[in-house]
């Protein structure tokens, strides 16, 4: 039976995955509506011409979410951990890069939650 620490780590992984599914939705399907509300620092006229670029970013967020969700269903505990560590590390790195190049908020909204979850995963099993 799994310990409570492992259950908390898995719940955190699912929450991080859901966040990235939400980002996918904004960037791929709602860039000109919800995207404008989310990315208020960008001028309104930029959304239509950058729709394709945003969709590409959304697709990458979908890959991150898919990897995290996949990690939950892997039967082998070591592989489950390895896959989760890989995808969480990708998100932490992207959060750091985003904070340096775009907005510090990216780290606090994406990188930090992934880093905390990564620590939880590393301390399980």
Question: Where in the sequence are the language-model features?
Answer:
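C-terminal structural segments of small proteins and small subunits
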Residues: 86-116
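Cytosolic, membrane-interface loops and tails of multi-pass inner-membrane proteins
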Residues: 28-50
């Amino acid at each position: 039976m799994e310990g409570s620490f492992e259950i908390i780590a898995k719940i955190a992984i699912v929450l991080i995955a859901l966040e990235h599914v939400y980002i996918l939705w904004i960037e791929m399907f709602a860039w000109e509506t919800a995207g404008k509300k989310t990315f208020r620092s960008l001028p309104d006229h930029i959304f239509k011409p950058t729709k394709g670029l945003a969709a590409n970013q959304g697709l990458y967020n979908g890959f991150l979410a898919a990897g995290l969700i996949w990690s939950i269903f892997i039967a082998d505990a070591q592989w489950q951990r390895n896959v989760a560590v890989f995808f969480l590390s990708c998100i932490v790195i992207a959060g750091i890069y985003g904070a340096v190049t775009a907005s510090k908020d990216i780290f606090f909204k994406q990188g930090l939650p992934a880093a905390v979850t990564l620590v939880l995963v590393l301390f399980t099993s």
